[in-house]
């Protein structure tokens, strides 16, 4: 898959530094990408909107880099990430779910419970259940336990594998 994105495709009207860091994150070598992810995350709120727009437009591999930057941006990213979880397809939703688990904000619990109940993708459901376990909210944990009872040991194994890897 092509990971490269042209500078003109990164359409942030604001800060040139944000544009340059997003470009470096998406196009740099591993070290450069990780440095850019850290720098973007440290900027907090100003990077959330441009990163969410990027999450919605780049290929699958690049989405995980964007999700890492959003997770590092912290609680300012929760509501926009919840919005992605509610409307996006699984390829975009999965990195957003991971980022929400990394942030650890309980505002994500109800939307994640909804995703666990409605997603048709076993991968998405397993990642969502792992995120709910990581968040540690009693309502989320209860929903995961209910899902384990309905789905069996195989699904529980996938969830625990995802949980231990997050």
Features from the language model and the residues they span:
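Structural detector for internal amphipathic alpha-helices that build alpha-solenoid repeat scaffolds
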Residues: 1-13, 23, 30-45, 53-56, ...
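Short terminal alpha-helical segments
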Residues: 19-25
